[in-house]
């Protein structure tokens, strides 16, 4: 059985200036701050912003490359309990030691063949 990805859950983005980025997305799209200082094991100023169906996880990297960078993107997965076995079956690299537990959800992080990190989450938007 395949993993059943339902939606793109969120986009995790490196930004040069956190305050400027939050202002941009608030002013242009009406996004609100869903979580202040991100408590997600990231050693950089960060926030989660968005609306009911879109979440952007922004963290500040002032000296990042001019073209920007997406740290990872997330899929909400219907059959979460099958992720580890399915990844092992296909030889997919599992990151961070397996299941990562958050306040309201849990995730498994994997690496695609091009080196992009994907977060496979149990609950849409991490329950935020």
Model regions and ranges:
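Conserved beta-strand in the GNAT
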Residues: 57-59, 109, 119
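Core segments of cupin and vicinal oxygen chelate
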Residues: 12-55
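Short glycine-enriched loop/turn motifs at secondary-structure junctions
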Residues: 4-7, 65-69, 101-102
